[in-house]
Every structure is written in C-alpha cells, then in structure tokens.
Amino acid sequence: SFFGILLWLKKEEEIDFFTAFFGGGPAYICYFFQCLQNMLEKKNIKKKVSIELIVTLFNGTINFIEKEKIEFKDLIKRVASKGGTTEKALKYFSQNNRFDSVITTAINKAENRSKELSKNQS
C-alpha cells in the first residue's frame, strides 16, 4: 500500500484495531500537521511556508530514525535537553498521560466504531 506494509493478522477480530489505527493513521497525522500549521499561522507564518516547514520537519525526523535505526525514546532524549524548551513541552504532554490518553481514547473510539460497522454488515 502507498501508506504502509501488508501485514497478515493472526485473528480476524484484530482487524478492527488495525482499521482504526492504521486505516485512519494518515488522517490522524494530518490532523496533527493541521494543528501545527494553525499555530504557525497564528505566529504570522504564511500557509505555504508553514506547510513546507512541517513537511520538512517530519521528513527529516523520519529519515533520521530510518538512517540511524534509533528508537523514538532515544531520539527524544537526544533532542530534549535537560531543563530546556523541548523538555518543558514534553513534560506538559506527559502530565497525567495527557497526550497518550487523548490518542489512546481516540483510537479506541475508532476501533469501537469499526466493530459497530462490522456488526451492521453481518
């Protein structure tokens, strides 16, 4: 597929989670991009420039991860200096599992919707 790889599932019931997580994945990522773009535009950065900056940021990050074969947590450690700006933002994200909780809840809702749609087709 254009967005991913082919993966055979061991159990048919796993399809709902994979549909929710990976089927919607490009939209979730673009939603995050859109949030970043909105922030940049509020800082008077033009739309075209903001899109280029965001795409370059994500492409560079992905390319680095692939080239260095580095785990996400290790790249975070390399970027987030102790007491620095990135660490401050990451602490806010992780307070009460804030960011993780939003993502997990959203994917769970999508998974439940996939199950509902499957039942309606039976």
Name these PLM-found stretches.
Residues 51-122:
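NAD(P)-dependent Rossmann-like dehydrogenase/reductase catalytic/cofactor-binding core
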